[in-house]
Amino acid sequence: MNRLPSSASALACSAHALNLIEKQTLDHEEMKALNREVIEYFKEHVNPGFLEYRKSVTAGGDYGAVEWQAGGLNTLVDTQGQEFIDCLGGFGIFNVGHRNPVVVSAVQNQLAKQPLHSQELLDPLRAMLAKTLAALTPGKLKYSFFCNSGTESVEAALKLAKAYQSPRGKFTFIATSGAFHGKSLGALSATAKSTFRKPFMPLLPGFRHVPFGHIEAMRTALSECKKTGDDVAAVILEPIQGEGGVILPPPGYLTAVRKLCDEFGALMILDEVQTGMGRTGKMFACEHENVQPDILCLAKALGGGVMPIGATIATEEVFSVLFDNPFLHTTTFGGNPLACAAALATINVLLEQNLPAQAEQKGDMLLDGFRQLAREYPDLVQEARGKGMLMAIEFVDNEIGYNFASEMFRQRVLVAGTLNNAKTIRIEPPLTLTIEQCELVIKAARKALAAMRVSVEEA
């Protein structure tokens, strides 16, 4: 690979990139050149801030680690040929593993026929995916709107709730502290981290936040809103807060919130973008309490780690506000054939291989190991928690969490922090992780903590 001059034309740049895409292997000099090139382009054309962020998850502050390809269902290989067990899972997109052959085959077969829809003829895979989700999701959820990401699925849910509740004079939304629902304007209004919110103030009016897991605070907020005429259109929350640090609510919390929503005539929106698709040991985390939302948000793992897709699924009663004019909320690429093919294949793999049950089994194994390490290293680890294959290790301060991620990188295990909680390291591997790989992850974590304790003692 010849290095492009800084004055290279768009044609030359695209040809250079296509040449890279065609390559299956890199020699040593090509690898070094590619690493330098990627770092330069991130700095000059993407965002230099990403380079600083990457330093927290690479050994010795060397942020030249550049991914090259999947090494298997559960591993990644960088340009230097180093293979990493993936315990980050692209923030939860690789539930069925990297390049799952069933998902890849479905997308390739659809690509050979028609990659994107005409927008005028009826597209069969969108209809089939909507039917499949109606059969898969809990309760009376029946109609699906498709988009490209989690934040888009939340935006659609908020607009759907507004359209349904506006004639009833209900305009207020209640979200929870520590919540993360995305960064577009509506979703950001429900998100609860000031770092993400302050630069874009004022956000949408009518959003209130109450402590997550505190049912009396939820009741008080709903009651006060009713007294002041600010009746609540919907409550939006995550069954388990992912970016908040993998925060689990008390048992029965979702059930109690469902009852409050029914009592006050508010819709219940569950954001299962991160907890859905088998991640917590059930297909959807709300199924642990048999709770049925009015609107359900999905994305991330829905596309099988091959295609981006989001979905907003609602009951017929709620979704029917869009029947008269289906163009009130649409997106060009939402529900495209490639994405729907990936989602249908993903659902098939999850069910055929019973991956939610595997997530429960292997998640218990990993969590037991992490909790044992927490007992062995109380000076470093505050707590290990989680459900299924969504886990977190919380350290006593941010710096220790940073060092743990770096040490795990040296052990060839990929982990990272959460967006709303810097001292918490998230463990979110593919559900296809093998028992042997689970054992290797626990072993790597023990080595990492031992090395960190030595560093602390020497300091």
UniProtKB/Swiss-Prot annotation:
InterPro entries, sorted: Aminotrans_3, Aminotrans_3_PPA_site, Class-III_PLP-dep_AT, Putrescine_aminotransferase, PyrdxlP-dep_Trfase, PyrdxlP-dep_Trfase_major, PyrdxlP-dep_Trfase_small
Necessary cofactors: pyridoxal 5'-phosphate
Pathway: Amine and polyamine degradation; putrescine degradation; 4-aminobutanal from putrescine (transaminase route): step 1/1
This protein's UniProt keywords: Aminotransferase, Pyridoxal phosphate, Transferase
Binding-site residues, pyridoxal 5'-phosphate: G150, T151, Q274, T332
Entry EC number(s): 2.6.1.82, 2.6.1.29
Top EC class for this record: transferase
PROSITE patterns to which the protein is assigned, alphabetical: AA_TRANSFER_CLASS_3
Modified residues (N6-(pyridoxal phosphate)lysine): K300
Gene Ontology biological-process entries: L-lysine catabolic process; putrescine catabolic process
Gene Ontology MF annotations: diamine transaminase activity; identical protein binding; putrescine--2-oxoglutarate transaminase activity; pyridoxal phosphate binding
Reaction(s) the record says it catalyses: an alkane-alpha,omega-diamine + 2-oxoglutarate = an omega-aminoaldehyde + L-glutamate; putrescine + 2-oxoglutarate = 1-pyrroline + L-glutamate + H2O; cadaverine + 2-oxoglutarate = 5-aminopentanal + L-glutamate
PANTHER family, per database record: AMINOTRANSFERASE CLASS III (PTHR11986), PUTRESCINE AMINOTRANSFERASE (PTHR11986:SF112)
Family membership: Belongs to the class-III pyridoxal-phosphate-dependent aminotransferase family. Putrescine aminotransferase subfamily.
Function: Catalyzes the aminotransferase reaction from putrescine to 2-oxoglutarate, leading to glutamate and 4-aminobutanal, which spontaneously cyclizes to form 1-pyrroline. This is the first step in one of two pathways for putrescine degradation, where putrescine is converted into 4-aminobutanoate (gamma-aminobutyrate or GABA) via 4-aminobutanal. Also functions as a cadaverine transaminase in a a L-lysine degradation pathway to succinate that proceeds via cadaverine, glutarate and L-2-hydroxyglutarate.
Protein name: Putrescine aminotransferase
Organism annotation: Escherichia fergusonii (strain ATCC 35469 / DSM 13698 / CCUG 18766 / IAM 14443 / JCM 21226 / LMG 7866 / NBRC 102419 / NCTC 12128 / CDC 0568-73)
Lineage: Bacteria, Pseudomonadati, Pseudomonadota, Gammaproteobacteria, Enterobacterales
Gene (name only): patA
